[in-house]
């Protein structure tokens, strides 16, 4: 059983996201350790990109701050290597096709494997174009995580059939960010996925409160939160670690 599958075993998974290098990589490292202590099941690490099309203003701002601070993909790989000396929590990169391309797809995935990454999410790569990445991901034992949006049933089934690791169910069309209400029928999406593939489904985009997380976890296997955490990093800078830990703890409780 892979580390990702293990993360969903017998429990609902809370999956936090953090932008690497906002405010700096040392703080990101401490955030990862504290998130695990607070009960996170799996952690998404955002590799900053200058044009993050799927992101709302909060995560766009974090990308900009990290890049301005001199964060590079190589420095992030070094950070993950250090993290792996202290924890075996599943780690998944979230970034954009361009970041992987410009590094060299093969080189990127070989390095990801060597430092101990478990998965990769590329929100700007549609299902029809994922194969060139998927072949290399499979070669290195990295799960390429599929995103499923509230679109047609046939499309959801088609994507679910080939999904690996877990399925990222997008709660609403549009960019990431916090929303006051999520109206998508997550239960129906999850049901369609499970009919095709016995794979965990986690819901993201727009979740920020424990109430929302609890509601999502009634029908899904986990909840993913990014913007609400990145807001704390922005607000408190290098002092954000205890605030993030506290927030993650409350969300983990809500997901139970």
Show which residues each predicted segment covers:
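N-terminal amphipathic alpha-helix/helix-capping segment at the start of soluble metabolic enzymes
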Residues: 1-18, 79-84
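Active-site beta->alpha loop and helix N-cap motifs at the rims of alpha/beta catalytic domains
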Residues: 47, 60-122, 255
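Alpha/beta catalytic cores of nucleotide-metabolism and tRNA/nucleoside-modifying enzymes
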Residues: 76, 191-199, 208-214, 218-256
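Catalytic beta/alpha-barrel core
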Residues: 68-71, 116-129, 143-151, 157, ...
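Glycine-rich phosphate-binding active-site loops on the catalytic face of alpha/beta enzymes
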Residues: 40-51, 117-121, 126-129, 171-177, ...
């Amino acid at each position: 059983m892979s580390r990702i599958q293990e993360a969903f075993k017998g429990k609902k998974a809370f999956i936090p996201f953090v932008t690497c290098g906002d405010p700096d990589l040392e703080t990101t490292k401490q955030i990862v350790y504290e998130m695990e202590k607070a009960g996170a099941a799996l952690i998404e690490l955002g590799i900053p990109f200058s044009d993050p099309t799927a992101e709302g203003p909060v995560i766009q701002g974090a990308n900009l701050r990290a890049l301005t601070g001199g964060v590079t993909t190589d420095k992030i790989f070094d950070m993950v290597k250090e993290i792996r000396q202290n924890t075996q929590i599943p780690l998944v990169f979230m970034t954009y096709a361009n970041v992987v391309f410009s590094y060299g797809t093969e080189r990127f995935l070989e390095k990801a494997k060597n430092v101990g990454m478990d998965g990769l999410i590329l929100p700007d790569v549609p299902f029809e174009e994922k194969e060139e990445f998927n072949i290399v991901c499979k070669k290195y034992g990295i799960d390429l995580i599929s995103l499923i949006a509230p679109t047609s049933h046939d499309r959801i089934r088609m994507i679910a059939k080939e999904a690996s690791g877990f399925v990222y169910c997008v709660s609403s069309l549009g960019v990431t960010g916090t929303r006051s209400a999520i109206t998508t029928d997550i239960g129906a999406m999850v049901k369609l996925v499970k009919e095709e593939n016995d794979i965990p489904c986690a819901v993201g985009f727009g979740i920020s409160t424990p109430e929302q997380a609890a509601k999502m976890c009634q029908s899904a296997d986990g909840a993913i939160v990014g913007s609400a955490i990145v807001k704390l990093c922005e607000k408190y800078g290098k002092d954000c670690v205890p605030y993030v830990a506290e927030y993650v703890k409350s969300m983990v409780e809500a997901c139970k």
